Structure formats: structure tokens, C-alpha cells
Regions:
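Basic nucleic-acid-binding interfaces
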Residues: 3-6, 12-74, 83-119
Length: 119
């Protein structure tokens, strides 16, 4: 599997964000040894950005809850908020999967607020 450049990530505004190179490569080493937990694998998949359309909706919701977000449901909209984070995350199902653009929004938040260190 080809990995993206671990030094820089680009958010939707085109600004470069440095993210934790050590954490990313630690995940790569754990994956090679096959000793990653469920949420570490999910974060690895989200950060690589190669399977945004294959992330299960329920797995993404559970990951956000594990990261400390509070969920509020209004119809088909699942809204996640966390103290200290300005943005709110709004997720909807696309069948049994999360919508790819919403997975990208979650990835940008994980990188921006360094939430990957919480797992």
C-alpha cells in the first residue's frame, strides 16, 4: 500500500498543516505487526485517505464518541460537538457507510486538533 506524504497534509482551504509524523509512522509499524486495535486501524484508514467511501457510518460515530464528542441526533443528522473544538461535525448515512466528504471533514479535524493522540 502506497502511503501519502506524512510530513504535510492539505486541508480544504489549501493551507498546509503539519501533522504528527511520529504518530503516523508508529501506526504503520503497528499495522505491519498486526497488533493495532479497532480504533487505531480506523484512524489509520481515515488519515491515509484512500478508502473514504468504505468507512462504516457506525464505526465513524463510535470513533468520534471515543474521542470525546457528544452526539445529538435530529432526524437523519448525527451532530457531534466537543468542548474546545469550534467546528461541529454533521454526519449522515449513505447506505451503511459514511459519506466520503464527511470522512474528509473528520480527517481534517483529527489533524487540526491532533485528536489522534487520544487513542
Amino acid at each position: 500500500m502506497e502511503l501519502p506524504d506524512a510530513d504535510l497534509k492539505t486541508d480544504t482551504a489549501g493551507k498546509r498543516q503539519h501533522f504528527q509524523k511520529d504518530f503516523f509512522y508508529r501506526l504503520v509499524r503497528l499495522k505491519k505487526r498486526k497488533i493495532m486495535g479497532k480504533y487505531q486501524k480506523l484512524i489509520f484508514t481515515i488519515l491515509t485517505g484512500q478508502a473514504d467511501n468504505k468507512i462504516k457510518f457506525i464505526d465513524l460515530c463510535n470513533l468520534l464518541k471515543k474521542l470525546g464528542f457528544e452526539e445529538r441526533v435530529r432526524g437523519s443528522h448525527h451532530i457531534f460537538r466537543k468542548e474546545g473544538i469550534i467546528e461541529k461535525i454533521n454526519l449522515q448515512k449513505d447506505g451503511s457507510h459514511a459519506k466520503p466528504y464527511q470522512v474528509k471533514q473528520v480527517r481534517n479535524l483529527i489533524i487540526k486538533y491532533k485528536l489522534m493522540e487520544k487513542i
